[in-house]
């Protein structure tokens, strides 16, 4: 199972009822954070999932409302006695940004493993997390992310016996390893069944809609996307390269995602004024995100 929490749903500046943008994923007991706006460590504390098993932080881009929570988060982790390294991933410019933000927390007790990615589509694996990255159009280099929980095919006893695989190697092959014995090579496909669908969650803020994004989020179990403005402010979002809620809904529909969470709302739109009735006419399974809203996504049989 993959647990998702929308820690903050605000864009530009925080409001009393709305922290700045951040999303937390929990998979096999480990955690991954996307973006770290001001006060992220506070909303994490309110959530109650703890800090200890946070392994990865992914930045979409380096505007202040997505990164200024980093010093507070690092100090919180340090005060909790953390010793394990924290991996931080982001587009070009990561080292410069982290160096600047961490001037006030030089005495943290753990290392930062910085992975500064080239501005191109790519995939990587960090610990429990399979991460896909897509460059998207914003005022500065910006990434959309997809987090996947991969699922091993089922072990098929009859197939292993049919292929005359020694039983002593079944476990190793089930784990994806090849085994060689007396000139014979045994491969995982000799004991495993068909590929099984995993869990896919896509996250995108601060960009204009593009065809590549629709492909990137295809068939996602959950698509979290900015809806900077609920009403028609098209010229405004084009100028600053953001997305309307209606545009996010069209991406969700074209991408055949199961559920859309809107986030990164303009501070001009308080929670009480968010009405997505018209948005749901475009994509019915749309939800207006709220701070610390959670969802558990299980594997399909």
Where are these regions (language model features)?
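Conserved beta-strand hairpin/beta-sheet module of binuclear metal-dependent hydrolase folds
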Residues: 1-47, 85, 145-147, 193-204, ...
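General small-molecule cofactor/ligand-binding pocket signal
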Residues: 5, 89, 113-118, 132-134, ...
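Active-site-proximal loop/helix segment associated with metal-binding centers of metalloenzymes
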Residues: 15, 129-203, 207-216, 222-224
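Active-site neighborhood of phospho(di)ester-bond hydrolases with catalytic His/Asp-centered motifs
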Residues: 34-37, 54-62, 90-91, 202-207, ...
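Active-site metal-binding motif and surrounding structural segment of the metallo-beta-lactamase
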Residues: 38-89, 111-121
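Metal-dependent catalytic neighborhoods of phosphoester/phosphodiester hydrolases
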Residues: 69-76, 98-101, 270-278
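A gly/proline- and charged-residue-enriched helix-loop-helix capping module
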Residues: 93-105, 114-119
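Binuclear metal-ion centers of metallo-dependent hydrolases, dominated by the metallo-beta-lactamase
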Residues: 120-121, 210-301
């Amino acid at each position: 199972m993959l647990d998702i929490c929308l820690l903050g749903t605000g864009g530009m500046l925080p409001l009393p009822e709305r922290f700045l943008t951040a999303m937390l994923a929990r998979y096999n007991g480990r955690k991954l954070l996307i973006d770290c706006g001001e006060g992220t460590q506070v909303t994490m504390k309110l959530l109650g999932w703890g800090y200890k098993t946070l392994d990865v932080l992914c930045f979409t881009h380096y505007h202040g409302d997505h990164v200024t929570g980093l010093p507070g988060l690092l100090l919180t982790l340090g005060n909790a006695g953390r010793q394990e390294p924290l991996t931080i991933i982001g587009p070009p410019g990561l080292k410069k940004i982290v160096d600047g933000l961490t001037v006030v927390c030089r005495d943290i007790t753990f290392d930062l493993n910085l992975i500064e990615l080239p501005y191109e589509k790519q995939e990587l694996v960090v610990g429990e997390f399979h991460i896909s990255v897509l460059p998207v159009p914003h005022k500065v280099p910006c990434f959309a992310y997809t987090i996947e929980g991969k699922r091993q095919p089922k072990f098929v006893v009859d197939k292993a016996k049919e292929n005359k695989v020694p039983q002593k190697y079944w476990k190793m092959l089930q784990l994806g390893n090849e085994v060689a014995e007396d000139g014979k090579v045994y491969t995982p496909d000799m004991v495993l069944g068909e590929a099984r669908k995993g869990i896919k969650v896509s996250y995108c803020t601060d960009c204009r809609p593009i065809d590549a994004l629709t492909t990137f989020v295809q068939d996602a179990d959950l698509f979290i996307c900015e809806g900077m403005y609920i009403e028609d402010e098209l010229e405004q979002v084009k100028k600053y390269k953001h997305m309307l809620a209606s545009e996010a809904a069209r991406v969700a529909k074209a991408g055949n995602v199961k559920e859309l969470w809107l986030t990164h709302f303009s501070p001009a739109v308080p929670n009480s004024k968010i009405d997505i009735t018209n948005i749901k006419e475009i994509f019915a399974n749309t939800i207006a995100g709220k701070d610390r809203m959670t969802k558990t996504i299980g594997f399909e049989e």
